[in-house]
Amino acid sequence: MKIKDLLNLSDPFWKYAATDKNGEIYFYNAKPRICNNSWGFADKNDIAIRIDNKFNELFDIEPFDGDWKDSLIEREE
């Protein structure tokens, strides 16, 4: 399963997904921007949730293939 598949199966509240420098997956309810600390995305005081690695293993989620800064994806409507 790809990250985009998981996002589209999640609650419609979650609009975006991205990974950080360590490969952790996050869902956001609004479009985030890259943090000044250069390790992940910021949620601009909106809500974000980290997807636990155990959940990743359960659903066999493929890691993002590429630079984490290019990992931001939007939910399909």
Model-derived segments and spans:
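Surface-exposed ligand/attachment interfaces on beta-rich extracellular proteins
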Residues: 1-10
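Short, surface-exposed beta-edge/turn micro-motifs
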Residues: 12-16, 22-25
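Residues in intrinsically disordered, low-complexity segments of regulatory proteins
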Residues: 13-15, 38, 67
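Intrinsic disorder/low-complexity segments
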Residues: 18-19, 31, 43, 49
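Short, surface-exposed terminal/edge motifs of secreted or surface/virion proteins that either
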Residues: 24-34, 38
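Low-complexity intrinsically disordered segments
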Residues: 42-77
